[in-house]
Amino acid sequence: MCGRPGDDGDMRSAVDVTVTGRVQGVSFRYYADREADRLGVAGWVRNEPDGTVAAHVEGDPGAVAAFVRWCHDGPRLAHVEQVDVRDGTDQGLRSFGVR
């Protein structure tokens, strides 16, 4: 996760995440949205046609890292097999949403 100063001068990082396993049909996106809100990160989460869940997350580097850690477990009904994380581009997003 690379960091850069945001508009307010605070360091920000951004990552793109792909979560593989039983992650659709188990409210993964709903709980990811709640976790993002709790952590104060911005971005989005969506289901992909191949059965994975994709997310773009940006904000405080520690909060982004905490979101990625949460993705390794996900909600109670999920069965996460793999979490791929790539450096993303900070888009200056200020909220998180389900797509």
UniProtKB/Swiss-Prot annotation:
It comes from Nocardioides sp. (strain ATCC BAA-499 / JS614). It catalyses: an acyl phosphate + H2O = a carboxylate + phosphate + H(+). The active site is at 29, 47. Belongs to the acylphosphatase family. This is Acylphosphatase. It is an enzyme of class 3 (hydrolase). The lineage of its organism: Bacteria, Bacillati, Actinomycetota, Actinomycetes, Propionibacteriales. Disulfide bonds: none annotated. Pfam families: Acylphosphatase.
